[in-house]
Design a protein with these regions (language model features):
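Chalcogenol-based redox active-site neighborhoods
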Residues: 1-220
Length: 220
């Protein structure tokens, strides 16, 4: 799935019953992410850390939706291991895990490793991740190999950046940005416009080229 492409509506079984994606999403953002296989070490840590941070996603109006090619009963059994390993998960496991044993959704969303596509019936998904806005568009995607687990803080940071720049369409977030730190004013915004948009001020950095394109503000 390319950025800004629309995720098609789909139906699938999950640990929380059948899901019709568009109805389930409602007006929320969605973190849709795949893992290679249940009952494996890195996947256990990933789903565990996302579950531990469930309230952080709720604060961002973001629903989490896990996915693999295992069946529903496998997911249900595995959840007990995740909760045991991550002892700080309280109560019911906070998000559904989609079952995709026929790999239909995995193929549609391009989650299968290119080297595994010839043996699709036994292929596992890579660690694919999509942040989907309420209009069903893919706003950000990440693809990690099976050997590398994902960073939950980076996922949250990306959601914060997307939601901020949707709200303030004249700014972008720089490298290593964190909520509350400086944002960059887009080059398409003139200094005069920036002064009106950010009346508390903004900073300009002189560049050797003479360009006036590095402007930052904390007042947003």
């Amino acid at each position: 799935m390319r950025l800004n492409s629309i995720v098609p509506d789909f139906k699938a079984d999950s640990t929380k019953g059948p899901i019709e994606f568009y109805d389930w999403q409602g007006d929320s953002w969605v973190l849709l992410f795949s893992h290679p296989s249940d009952f494996t070490p890195v996947c256990t840590t990933e789903l565990g850390r996302i579950a531990v941070n469930a309230t952080q996603f709720v604060k961002r109006n973001t629903k989490c939706l896990a996915h693999s090619v295992d069946d529903t009963q496998s997911h249900i059994n595995w959840v007990n291991d995740i909760k045991s390993y991550c002892a700080d998960i309280r109560g019911e496991f906070p998000f559904p895990i989609l079952a995709d044993p026929n790999r239909q959704l995995a193929i549609t969303l391009g989650m299968i490793d290119e080297e595994k596509r010839e043996d699709i019936e036994s292929a596992k998904t890579v660690r694919a991740l999509f942040i989907i806005s309420p209009d069903h568009r893919v706003r950000l995607s990440m693809f990690y190999p099976m050997t590398t687990g994902r960073n939950v803080n980076e996922i949250l940071r990306c959601i914060d950046s997307l939601q901020l720049t949707d709200r303030l369409k004249t700014v972008a977030t720089p490298a290593n940005w964190m909520p509350g730190s400086k944002v960059m004013i887009l080059p398409s915004v003139t200094d005069e416009e920036a002064a009106k948009l950010f009346p508390k001020g903004f900073d300009k950095t002189s560049m050797p080229s003479g360009g006036n394109y590095v402007r930052t503000t904390e007042n947003y």
